[in-house]
């Protein structure tokens, strides 16, 4: 390699400076991750070269044997990671090593918790793994040449992690990237063959290409070979191609960490080989925690796609529906061509068939997790439940299966935890109950004592309590389960069917008829604020509630539409009153029209508050309430 030419000194992006400070001063509790990250990057570089060489075989430059080499020099106190992958041009080195184009650094810094171990785990997830080199090194030199460029267009990038880096042109005959870490004082333990082999075995045994180290020579100096001999220190076979019976749980876990850039273990995995009309192998994982960008429109999602063990692309989104975007893994097909593109993957019988099978496989994996490890499934639900709730709208064919995986709060569990599955709910149905009842609201605390639940408590009927913002939208698609319809207890004229006896229904009709005059007076007092006034069959303790019209939007959907800037159709609630409540009896007896109107409006406003709605005229409510309280105190 020749002397550096055309040397420049450039400054790091502001966020990268912050990141470097973090690496240098804070993340020292798990230093060995630097090797995991740099080897993982080298493996990605090899994958990219394989893919580009499908179209341009000349990029292999006569050498298709891809490998990663890890070496060390005790005297010089250096560790070197060398690959013959795709390599970098000068422009690549400046843009990839001096800035983070996708704002990954800013997001990384935003998610730091101050817990060293947790923060170290975030490094790979946010695509900033290269900078982990500065955990153990006070200077990092990178020598690289992109495949296809002439030897004279190599690049030397160098930095001490202090806000600036140098970049220069060098001659580099061989393609790929060599990273030289100059170890800090006190980090000499990493300039040791056994230490490095141990770390590679721990983190990188699953990497699908050879990771080589120099053979240790323990004999006489005269017997030492003139050229160093290299030996693979990992299995160097794609994990998913091996028989399941030969793979340990720890190997699956390390492979997941490699492909997901996550230092935590997965909650579950499913490894399957399909033979017959279609031939492919899949290895799918359920992560233990949600990525920071799970709900971002442009977040990374999809599986790693291989064709006959040749890497084709990351984030192949076409093999799983959007509601399963949290699933990580690989799919290796024998039925797709090596020159497959994202456009080709958009449709076609092979892709459609694989998507259908992989979707079912993912849902089966979640069912097994829920059955065998309910505590782990509770963790999954906390992290990914809202994404799964998108399923019934997107995947009609699997709607029942998805519904069975959902968990909700209910009146059966007073902790408020989302722990109740629909199958459990159905198993507890009251005698004669043929409907599944639910109530939506902003929070468990807000709806657990809702007046809408009073008649259900009286009859001992369980009601699901749905408090995620997406729930009302979800229930517009999830209309039944196990052959039974869902009923919103706050919507329309509640009909309990067989849960009410014929005598009960007859008595309700008689009461409603006897209170028609009161209903008309209240409607006149409330005017355009309500669509209708009627006697309630829902209430046992409260004086009044607001019911949602059968075809109207509920509060959650109105808020969702407003938040997204969409027009919200106008709707008016139905005012229902409890004819046996003392306040309603007092209202019925009130002859003073002003007092009647004030009391009616106060009852309406209280019902709105109980439903979680805001008041149009809070000052008017307070004024009327104070007036009534003052009259009572006289």
UniProtKB/Swiss-Prot annotation:
InterPro entries in the cross-refs: HATPase_C_sf, Heat_shock_protein_90_CS, HSP90_C, Hsp90_fam, Hsp90_N, Ribosomal_Su5_D2-typ_SF
Q: Extract the ranges annotated as region (B).
A: 343-559
Q: Where is this region: C?
A: 560-634
**What compartments host this protein?**
Cytoplasm
Chain segments carrying region A: 1-342
| Keywords annotated in UniProt | ATP-binding, Chaperone, Cytoplasm, Nucleotide-binding, Stress response
Task: Please give the Gene3D superfamilies that the UniProt record associates with this protein.
Answer: 3.30.230.80, 3.40.50.11260, Heat shock protein 90, C-terminal domain (1.20.120.790), Histidine kinase-like ATPase, C-terminal domain (3.30.565.10)
The primary site where this protein sits is cytoplasm
Single GO term (MF) = unfolded protein binding
Which GO cellular component terms, listed alphabetically, does the Swiss-Prot or TrEMBL entry include?
cytoplasm
Q: Which family does it belong to?
A: Belongs to the heat shock protein 90 family.
* Stored HAMAP family: HSP90
Relate the protein's function as given in its record. Molecular chaperone. Has ATPase activity.
What subunit structure does UniProt give? Homodimer.
* Family matches, as NCBIfam families: PRK05218.1 (NF003555)
Q: What is this protein's name?
A: Chaperone protein HtpG
Give the source species.
Xanthomonas oryzae pv. oryzae (strain KACC10331 / KXO85)
């Amino acid at each position: 390699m020749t002397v550096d030419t055309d040397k420049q000194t450039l400054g790091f992006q502001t966020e990268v400076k912050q990141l470097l400070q973090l690496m240098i001063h804070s993340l020292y509790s798990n230093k060995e991750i630097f090797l995991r990250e740099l080897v993982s990057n080298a493996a990605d570089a090899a994958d990219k070269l394989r893919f580009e060489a499908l179209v341009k075989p000349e990029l292999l430059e006569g050498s298709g044997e891809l490998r990663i080499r890890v070496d060390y020099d005790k005297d010089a106190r250096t560790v070197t990671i060398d690959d013959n992958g795709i390599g970098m041009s000068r422009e690549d080195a400046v843009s990839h090593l001096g800035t983070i184009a996708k704002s990954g650094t800013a997001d990384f810094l935003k998610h730091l918790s101050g817990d060293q171990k947790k923060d170290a785990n975030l490094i790979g997830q946010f695509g900033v793994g290269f900078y982990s080199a500065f955990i153990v090194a006070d200077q990092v030199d990178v020598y690289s040449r992109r495949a296809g460029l002439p030897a004279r267009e190599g690049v030397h990038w160098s930095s001490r992690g202090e806000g600036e880096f140098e970049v220069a042109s060098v001659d580099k005959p061989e393609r790929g990237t060599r990273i030289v870490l100059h170890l800090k004082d006190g980090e000499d333990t990493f300039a040791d063959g056994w230490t490095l082999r141990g770390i590679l075995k721990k983190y990188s045994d699953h990497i699908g290409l050879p990771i080589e180290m120099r053979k240790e020579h323990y004999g006489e100096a005269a017997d030492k070979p003139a050229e160093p001999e290299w030996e693979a220190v990992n299995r160097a076979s794609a994990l998913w191609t091996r028989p399941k019976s030969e793979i340990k749980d720890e190997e699956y876990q390390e492979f997941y960490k490699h492909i997901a850039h996550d230092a935590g273990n997965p909650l579950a995995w499913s490894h399957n080989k399909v033979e017959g009309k279609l031939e492919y192998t899949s290895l799918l994982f359920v992560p233990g925690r949600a990525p920071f960008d799970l709900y971002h429109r442009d977040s990374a999602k999809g599986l790693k796609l291989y064709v006959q063990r040749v890497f084709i692309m990351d984030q192949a989104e076409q093999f799983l529906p959007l509601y399963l975007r949290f699933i990580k893994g690989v799919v290796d097909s024998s039925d797709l061509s090596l020159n497959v593109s994202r456009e080709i993957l958009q449709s076609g019988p092979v892709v459609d068939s694989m998507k259908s099978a992989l979707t079912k496989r993912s849902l089966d994996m979640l069912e097994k997790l829920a059955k065998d490890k309910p505590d782990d499934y509770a963790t999954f639900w906390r992290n990914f439940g809202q994404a799964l709730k998108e399923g019934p709208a997107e995947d009609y064919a699997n709607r029942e299966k998805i519904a069975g995986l959902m968990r909700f709060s209910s009146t059966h569990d007073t902790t408020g935890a989302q722990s109740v599955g629909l199958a459990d709910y159905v198993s507890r149905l009251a005698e004669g109950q043929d409907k599944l009842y639910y109530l939506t609201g902003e929070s468990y605390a807000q709806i657990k004592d809702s007046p809408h639940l009073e008649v259900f408590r009286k009859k001992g009927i369980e009601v699901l309590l749905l408090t995620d913002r997406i729930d009302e939208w979800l229930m517009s698609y999830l209309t039944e389960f196990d052959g039974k319809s869902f009923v919103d207890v706050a919507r329309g004229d509640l009909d309990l069917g067989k849960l009410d006896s014929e005598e009960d229904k007859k008595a309700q009709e008689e009461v409603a008829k006897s209170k028609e005059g009161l209903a008309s007076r209240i409607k006149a007092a409330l005017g355009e604020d309500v669509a209708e006034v009627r006697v309630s069959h829902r209430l046992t303790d409260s004086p009044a509630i607001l019911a949602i019209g059968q075809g109207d939007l509920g509060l959650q959907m109105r808020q969702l539409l407003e938040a997204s800037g969409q027009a919200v159709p106008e709707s008016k609630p139905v005012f229902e009153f409890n004819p046996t409540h003392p306040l309603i009896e007092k209202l019925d007896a009130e002859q003073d029209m002003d007092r009647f109107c004030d009391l009616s409006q106060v009852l309406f406003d209280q019902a709105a508050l109980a439903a979680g709605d805001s008041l149009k005229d809070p000052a008017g409510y307070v004024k009327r309430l104070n007036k009534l309280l003052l009259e009572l105190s006289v």
